């Protein structure tokens, strides 16, 4: 990392390169030439250039000379604010920094003893603490503050020495290469954004030495409070906080920044720094609140804090992502990129967040822009490759993943995701190589160990797969690992049996057409119904909507009304923007962890919001949304249907009535089918528009709505099968395994009454049967539990014994 001195010299060389008339300022033409020259890969239009220049000259108005343009100090400020990468621009322009230039000022100073003494003191100040302290924008203002900083540095050094001696100071050793992960683009300082490449340090806070340190730190804080003015006290607490932050004493730094907030509530800097501390401490909600206060202060402070807005937006977005609020984070990343078009981290974060909510095309566009601005950005390459893979552009994705790995050979995310891509393509040997490289960087990555086992199994290396599974079991005791080991044992037994007679070269299963699957008994689910219900149940489990009581949806409608707006068609609706909808979902799914909630939002955005926002306006009809999610929420089925009906009543067109229009009812049912049964529903959606006019005056009662809803052919009759899955899909059937996939049967067991083999839910729904049981048709009986199967067996034995008695 460049020192402050070399950094400023580089900026000066760049400034001189484009100050063509040597008047000490960069006019619009000179600035335009600079922007184009440092972005050789970007083809700017005249409109884009003018927009960038307008933004620069407006944001940095205090550094604009009316007759000359942007001054050197102004250009330095733009780089300090993260608007560009000094090192990258310097290299792109082919400039060189002479070593002698940094020492000229020192030699000139020797001509005057008094000046020499003064400059020597300043130089010592610069050397004894971090570069931020001497920054003209955010540095130390009062001389007394320097004394506090000096004393604090001594205290920290003493604490570090004692804890290192006692072996109490711990670095984060969970992995061997922290820098191998995709960075968050975290703007740590009120200056240039920088990646956190050093390891996290954990201080032993319960030790006696730490207690003494905190006590002595309290004395320094008291000195800061006893300053001659409020401004000097603020300066002292900010400096103390920043020194503590640099040494990763985040809890203590937070105390200082909070005190600085009390002294100057309208200053952006302490709120920003407090937000950073809270985020590092894992308190994302409190971090978000501090950044919102910083944003409020910056927006009300006029141009004084305008240059900080992009970084506040970026860190606010990161804090929101920490809560799982990815749609909201996208909004702030987008704002940062608009304010600062060369902010490559904002563009990368925007692309990554868009990928996280399933908007892959938009993600690719943002990530490609980030890479144009920073071609060696490994993390952007990694997420771009993941987006391309999600769009089906696998060969290009492999190339981009490889580029990310070339840029950063130990990049865990790129290696792991490339392994997953190779698995999807059936290239198991290459996949196992990628997972092996992940484990080289991060030895206790249990998912990589498990996936390595699966890829080795796919490559036919059963013994190696078994060893890899055992290694994974040492790292975690998750139940799926036990199932996988059991699965391997069954495969080995089957392989041993087949060595004698074989299957005639056939695969592990054959797929039978649906008409050949017959059911025995009224309770046995039809194969097509189960296949559809399994897909809906999978969506329900990913979104965790089953954890949301449907009464909470009713309460949300009652307590938080949505203002009426008018859509493009002119009809009144209660619609809100997607980020606001995300806030409502966060309340409904408040028990979810952030990463789980993020997965839920992605699934809902892809499956539901994409259809509800078919115009691409970014707004969603909330009445229709509540009605669509109600059938999958928790609670009795009758309550779910009632809430769905009430949600349609809540829409402006039906409000105040006890009945809904038939248009709404038909549209809802067809939308429900289009979302959850897409193979049937999409064509039906096209018919709705032609029916609206004729049915707009016809109303539907709740009982009529129920009849429409429960219709097995034209309604959502599949819900009865979904309810059965909800009740039984965690049931285990003892030692019973599926005859096709060889995994333990979980959920219902489907037993073929003639051949007597058993299938799990998934294989039955997909129509898979063992190749050794070829029949003209298959008759299945469904058992929801093993107790039910035993009961049926006892009844069968009883009937047989009666028959024998009669025969004799």
From Swiss-Prot:
Protein name in the entry: Uncharacterized TPR repeat-containing protein At1g05150
Domain of life: Eukaryota
InterPro entries: EF-hand-dom_pair, EF_hand_dom, TPR-like_helical_dom_sf, TPR_rpt
Annotated coiled-coil segments of the chain: 773-794
Database matches in PROSITE patterns: EF_HAND_2 (PS50222), TPR (PS50005), TPR_REGION (PS50293)
Organism: Arabidopsis thaliana
GO cellular component term of the entry, any: Golgi apparatus
Ranges for the TPR repeats: 234-267, 269-301, 310-343, 344-377, 378-411, 412-445, 447-479
Domain EF-hand: start-end pairs: 6-41, 600-635
UniProtKB keywords: Coiled coil, Metal-binding, Repeat, TPR repeat
MF terms in GO: calcium ion binding
Gene3D superfamilies assigned to the protein according to its UniProt record, in alphabetical order: EF-hand, Tetratricopeptide repeat domain
Keyword Metal-binding attached: yes
Entry keyword annotation includes Kinase: no
């Amino acid at each position: 990392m460049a020192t402050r001195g070399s950094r400023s010299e580089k900026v000066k060389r760049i400034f001189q390169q484009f100050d063509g008339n040597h008047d000490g300022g960069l006019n619009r033409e000179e600035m335009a030439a600079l922007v184009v020259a440092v972005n050789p890969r970007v083809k700017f239009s005249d409109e884009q250039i003018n927009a960038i220049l307008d933004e620069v000259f407006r944001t940095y108005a205090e550094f604009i000379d009316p007759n000359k343009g942007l001054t050197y100090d102004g250009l330095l400020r733009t780089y300090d604010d993260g608007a560009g990468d000094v090192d990258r621009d310097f290299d792109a322009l082919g400039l060189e920094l002479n070593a002698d230039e940094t020492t000229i000022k020192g030699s000139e100073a020797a001509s005057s003893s008094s000046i020499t003494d003064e400059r020597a003191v300043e130089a010592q100040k610069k050397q004894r603490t971090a570069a931020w302290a001497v920054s003209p924008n955010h540095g130390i203002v009062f001389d007394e503050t320097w004394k506090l900083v000096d004393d604090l540095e001594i205290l920290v050094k003493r604490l570090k020495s004692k804890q290192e001696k006692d072996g109490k100071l711990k670095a984060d050793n969970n992995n061997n290469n922290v820098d191998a992960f995709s960075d968050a683009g975290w703007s740590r300082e009120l200056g240039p954004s920088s990646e956190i490449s050093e390891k996290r340090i954990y201080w032993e806070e319960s030790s006696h030495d730490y207690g003494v340190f905190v006590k002595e730190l309290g004395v320094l804080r008291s000195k800061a409070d006893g300053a001659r003015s409020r401004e000097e006290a603020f300066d002292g607490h900010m400096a103390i906080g920043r020194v503590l932050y640099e040494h990763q004493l985040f809890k203590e730094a937070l105390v200082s920044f909070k005190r600085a907030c009390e002294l100057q509530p309208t200053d952006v800097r302490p709120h920003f720094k407090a937000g950073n501390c809270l985020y590092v401490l894992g308190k994302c909600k409190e971090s978000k609140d501090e950044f919102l206060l910083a944003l409020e202060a910056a927006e009300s402070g006029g141009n004084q804090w305008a240059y900080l807005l992009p970084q506040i937006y970026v860190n606010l977005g990161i804090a929101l992502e920490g809560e799982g609020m990815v749609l909201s984070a996208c909004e702030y990343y987008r704002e940062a990129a608009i304010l600062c078009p060369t902010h490559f981290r904002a563009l990368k974060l925007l692309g990554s967040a868009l990928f996280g909510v399933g908007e892959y095309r938009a993600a690719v566009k943002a990530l490609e822009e980030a890479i144009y601005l920073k071609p060696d950005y490994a993390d952007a390459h990694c997420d771009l490759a993941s987006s391309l893979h999600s769009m089906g552009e696998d060969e290009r994705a492999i190339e981009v993943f490889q580029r990310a790995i070339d840029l950063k050979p130990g990049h865990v995310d790129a290696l792991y995701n490339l392994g997953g891509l190779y698995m999807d393509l059936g290239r198991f040997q290459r996949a196992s190589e990628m997972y092996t490289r992940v484990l080289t960087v991060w030895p206790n990555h249990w998912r990589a160990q498990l996936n390595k086992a699966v890829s080795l199994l796919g490559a036919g290396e059963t013994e190696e797969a078994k060893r890899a599974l055992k290694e994974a079991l040492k790292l975690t005791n998750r139940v799926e690992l036990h199932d996988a080991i059991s699965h391997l044992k069954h495969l080995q037994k089957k392989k041993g049996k087949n060595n004698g007679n074989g299957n005639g070269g056939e695969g592990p299963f054959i797929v039978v057409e649906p008409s050949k699957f017959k059911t025995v008994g009224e309770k046995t689910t039809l194969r097509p119904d189960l296949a559809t219900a399994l897909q809906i149940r999978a969506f329900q489990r990913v979104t965790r909507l089953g954890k949301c009581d449907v009464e909470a949806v009713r309460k949300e409608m009652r307590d938080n009304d949505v203002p009426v707006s008018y859509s493009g068609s002119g009809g009144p609706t209660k619609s809100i923007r997607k980020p606001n909808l995300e806030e409502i979902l966060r309340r409904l799914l408040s028990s979810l962890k952030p990463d789980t909630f993020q997965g839920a939002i992605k699934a809902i955005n892809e499956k539901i919001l994409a259809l509800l926002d078919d115009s691409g306006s970014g707004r969603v009809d909330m009445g229709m949304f509540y009605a669509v999610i109600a059938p999958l929420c928790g609670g009795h089925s009758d309550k779910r249907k009632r809430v769905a009906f009430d949600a349609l009543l809540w829409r402006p067109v039906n409000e105040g009535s006890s009945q809904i229009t038939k248009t709404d009812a038909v549209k809802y049912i067809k939308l429900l089918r289009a979302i959850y049964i897409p193979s049937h529903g999409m064509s039906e959606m096209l018919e709705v528009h032609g029916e609206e006019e004729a049915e707009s005056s016809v109303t539907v009662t709740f009982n009529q709505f129920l009849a429409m809803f429960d219709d097995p052919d034209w309604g959502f009759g599949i819900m009865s099968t979904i309810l059965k899955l909800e009740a039984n899909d965690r049931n285990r059937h003892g030692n019973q395994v599926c005859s096709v996939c060889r995994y333990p049967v979980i959920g219902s067991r489907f037993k073929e009454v003639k051949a007597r083999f058993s299938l799990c839910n998934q294989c039955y729904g997909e129509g898979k049967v063992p190749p050794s049981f070829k029949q003209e048709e298959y008759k299945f009986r469904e058992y929801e539990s093993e107790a039910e199967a035993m009961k049926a067996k006892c009844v069968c034995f009883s009937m047989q014994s009666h028959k024998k008695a009669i025969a004799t």
